[in-house]
Regions:
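Hydrophobic alpha-helical segments in the ANL/AMP-binding
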Residues: 23, 73-91, 144-146, 165-177
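Adenylate-forming
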Residues: 70, 201-249
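Conserved AMP-binding/adenylate-forming
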Residues: 40, 55-95, 161
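Conserved AMP-binding/adenylate-forming core of the ANL superfamily
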Residues: 11-14, 18-19, 23, 31-59, ...
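Conserved AMP-binding A3 loop
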Residues: 43-44, 115-142
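Conserved pre-ATP/AMP-binding loop-to-beta segment of ANL
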Residues: 13-16, 30, 105-119, 126, ...
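ATP-dependent adenylate-forming carboxylate-activation enzymes
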Residues: 8, 50, 69-70, 90-102, ...
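Conserved AMP-binding/adenylation subdomain of ANL enzymes
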Residues: 138-155, 163-206, 220
Length: 253
């Protein structure tokens, strides 16, 4: 059985895109669970097969392709497949954005090497499309692996929208190390968050929680959260300030 040590890249590897790593994951760890979402899961072999099948259905190159970034395995299959087909992924939070945002992409010249166009939330004005290159995705992933310790046996719970860099940036390192993603639909149902940590995957869990979600867990489920302390490798936070009091409570939960 191959381990995470076997997975370490050498100077002979020339993997330039997330999908290059996904293909390697499927070859090295075909039966490892890649993604879990509700009652559905898929291995790296199954994921890669779905991605290549979907990629074959695209007959364009270099085009911006919009899709609704629902919290599903199919969403990530579509995301990877768009890249694999040589097109640019435009994940949108809801279908109503299609006409407005796609008008913006049609007016733009998309340089070679662009993987995604991600739209900002518009908190400082109108929503803007930001181009993300394949090389940026890989660099982002490598930085997170080095700084936060993403590894092959880690399961990362994603609870945010897959149209947002905050969630997609956690997909990147997990694919590079051949770990597992667990997708849940937000944090409105705390039980789903804990059910994700009850899933029968090897290793430990990590997640990203905005400060409001941390406050919710500490207020309504601190004792329950403490029961999982030995299974949680780290909790990343950001997007807003977190109080010193909440940070201390989280550390000692």
């Amino acid at each position: 059985m191959k381990t995470s040590e076997d997975y370490m890249l050498t100077s002979e590897d020339h993997l330039l895109t997330l999908e290059d790593y996904l293909e390697k994951d499927a070859a090295l760890f075909p039966d490892k669970v890649a993604i879990i979402c509700g009652e559905e899961s898929c291995t790296y072999r199954q994921l890669w097969n779905r991605v290549t099948d979907t990629a074959a259905s695209f007959h364009s190159k270099g085009q911006a392709i919009p899709f609704v970034a629902s919290p599903t395995i199919e969403c990530l299959v579509t995301y990877f497949a768009i890249h694999r087909s040589g097109n640019v992924a435009v994940p949108l939070e809801q279908e109503s954005q299609f006409s407005e945002e796609m008008n913006k992409t049609e007016e733009a010249s998309i340089p070679a090497g662009v993987a995604d166009i991600l739209f900002t939330t518009g908190t400082t004005g109108k929503s803007k499309g930001v181009m993300i290159s394949h090389s940026t995705i890989i660099a982002n992933a490598e930085n997170l692996i080095e700084a936060q310790g993403f590894h092959h046996d880690l399961t990362f719970i994603i609870n945010g929208p897959l149209s947002h860099i905050g969630s997609l940036s956690k997909v990147y390192p997990i694919i590079l190390v051949g770990g597992t993603l667990h997708i849940i639909d937000g944090m409105k149902d705390i039980n789903r968050f804990f059910q994700a940590m009850d899933s029968p995957t090897e290793g430990k869990f990590a997640t990203f929680l905005v400060p409001a979600s941390i406050r919710m867990l500490l207020t309504f489920a601190s004792d329950r959260l403490a029961l999982y302390a030995d299974r949680i490798e780290f909790i990343e936070t950001g997007a807003a300030p977190i109080s010193q009091n909440d940070m201390e409570k989280l550390c000692f939960a």
